[in-house]
């Protein structure tokens, strides 16, 4: 599951446009990754735009992917801990969105546990999201 991406080329383009991306390994296997953008990017996501309109400097999480059989085993926490260290170097808030319709309760719980607070709501034709931020 990589959100609304339709091809490997689209993922490659997203990575090239991103400001920060890294992955987590289990031995030699990539089991997860995160893709992030900074302010001022050419990225045209409406969710990214929400934060662009209200934050001067920020780190936006666009994608987090953990291979299904490795979920709830600490891989996501590891990615977020590393991301927090990077953000702290420049005192950047970390921003993201989580689906609220259909609800992604696991992700909402994860972000709440990691001190993300709701700063807005986005409504779209086929879904809605909560905008979250961690200082």
Residue map of PLM features:
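Conserved active-site alpha-helix within GNAT-family acetyltransferase domains
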Residues: 100-120
């Amino acid at each position: 599951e990589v959100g609304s991406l339709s091809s490997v080329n689209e993922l490659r383009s997203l990575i090239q446009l991103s400001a920060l991306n890294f992955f987590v390994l289990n031995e030699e296997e990539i089991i997860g990754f995160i893709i992030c953008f900074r302010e001022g990017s050419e990225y045209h996501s409406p969710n990214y735009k929400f934060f662009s309109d209200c934050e001067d400097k920020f780190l936006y999480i666009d994608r987090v992917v953990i291979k299904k059989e490795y979920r709830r085993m600490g891989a996501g926490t590891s990615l977020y801990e590393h991301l927090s260290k990077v953000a702290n170097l420049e005192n950047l808030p970390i921003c993201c969105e989580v689906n609220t319709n259909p609800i992604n309760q696991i992700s909402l719980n994860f972000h709440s546990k990691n001190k993300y607070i709701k700063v807005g709501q986005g409504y779209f034709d086929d879904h809605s999201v909560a905008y979250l931020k961690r200082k």
